[in-house]
Amino acid sequence: MVSNSVTPNHVSLVSYNIEGLSSLYDADTRLYLSAFDFCLLVETFASSVPSHLFPEHDVIITPGVRLTEAVTARLSGGLALLVKKQRSSFVERVHVEYDNMIVLKVSKDLLGTEKPVVLLGVYLPPSSSSYYHKTDIQNGVAMIEQCILDVIGSFGDLPLILFGDFNARTGNENSDAADTVDCGFDIFGNSEDAHSSPHRVSKDTVVNDFGRYLLNVCTEFA
């Protein structure tokens, strides 16, 4: 039986682009991913993930999307969010009407925060993808922005952690947003000063339109 109360501690989270389910049959990859409390598998190209691969986790799915009308067309994108079973009682899925997004509301009792925290896991197809031929919104980051607004409309202004593969190149630029998750410790153990924005050092110095928009969204909702 899972306890409904825990002593707040560091929570581990990762986003990992698997480019199809075949990579999950590598034992070393599964061992690495299984260590995390929350593990977002990106680009599953599938509608499900075999549950026996991660017996210690519950699996939350948003299926891939066919980019053509052909029934035989391969699914594109797709997410699977693994949640360790001892954490699952502290997690509520928030259903949203967007492809390639998973939203969870995580209890303050797990994180030691004053409010629940929203996890928003995302895969954005690149700007050149034919996916955008079938949508009203041509900039994928604008979909994230609208999803955040929907969550705020439902739950108020909760702290939010955004993670995934955005196909957004930000170079060495950073947003003006600080880490404002309202807890007395760094829940992810990322830095000594959890409320500062670290200096980015990236080998990819290019900034694209998705990247600029993403930085603006981070600042907008800080």
Residues of each region from the PLM?
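A shared catalytic/ligand-binding motif for oxyanion handling
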Residues: M1-A222
